[in-house]
């Protein structure tokens, strides 16, 4: 099992973080996805990385104390660690038994990072995979005329046969998390997440995604 903390969960010294990690230890939840460090336009990049790494070091200590692993998720956009290459700016030098890479194939598609290269970059830290589709949808009346958008599996730009076959070749045995983020609910996700509301038909689309994923996994393992 894995748990996902709020997007602003980046202070390891907070009471919330201390309790969160202790609760995961007590509940035998071994993987904890923390929040994101955002890049602000005009910031110097490497000092921003240094600040984020100091906070990540605190999460690594919490992981060691509670016998869990902290996960950093690749998320396209102005996020430190937005892709596999950038994520290694955060992770390099830390013990991979205490901190890991949670790669997201949908966001890799949006950022244009090659699957094989990205996985090779984070191979030492690879701990979990995020499963969602992503592509750039046309919006001809606006500038730019395309925008990032989520999609059901098989409807976006991710080559799922290649992605999953690469994981099999790497003997990856971590969790694959179906994110259930789709075109019809992107506004909801960006505003409030699913804590307070969810779009209609979510379970049905999610079930189709899981069936799609299992079908490819079966073909890949054959």
Question: Could you tell me what each predicted segment is?
Answer:
Residues 28, 83-103, 109-222:
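Histidine-acidic metal/acid-base catalytic patches
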Residues 1-101, 196, 200-204:
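Active-site acidic/histidine proton-transfer and metal-coordination neighborhood
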């Amino acid at each position: 099992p894995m748990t996902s903390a709020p997007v602003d969960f980046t202070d390891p010294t907070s009471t919330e973080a201390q309790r969160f990690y202790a609760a995961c230890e007590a509940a035998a939840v071994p993987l904890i996805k923390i929040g994101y460090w955002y890049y602000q336009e005009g910031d110097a990049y490497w000092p921003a990385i240094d600040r984020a790494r100091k906070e990540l070091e605190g999460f690594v200590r919490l992981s060691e104390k509670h016998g869990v692993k902290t996960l950093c998720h690749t998320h396209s956009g102005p996020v430190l660690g937005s892709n596999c290459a950038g994520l290694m700016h955060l992770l390099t030098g830390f013990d991979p038994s205490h901190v890991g890479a949670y790669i997201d194939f949908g966001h890799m598609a949006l950022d244009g990072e090659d699957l094989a290269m990205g996985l090779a970059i984070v191979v030492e830290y690879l701990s979990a995979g995020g499963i969602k589709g992503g592509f750039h949808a046309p919006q001809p009346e606006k500038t730019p005329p395309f925008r990032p958008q989520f999609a059901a599996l098989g409807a976006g730009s991710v080559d799922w046969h290649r992605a999953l076959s690469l994981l099999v070749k790497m003997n990856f045995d971590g969790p694959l998390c179906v994110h259930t983020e789709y075109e019809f609910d992107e506004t909801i996700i960006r505003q409030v997440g699913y804590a307070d509301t969810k779009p209609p038909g979510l379970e049905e689309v999610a079930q189709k995604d899981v069936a799609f994923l299992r079908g490819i996994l079966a073909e890949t393992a054959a």
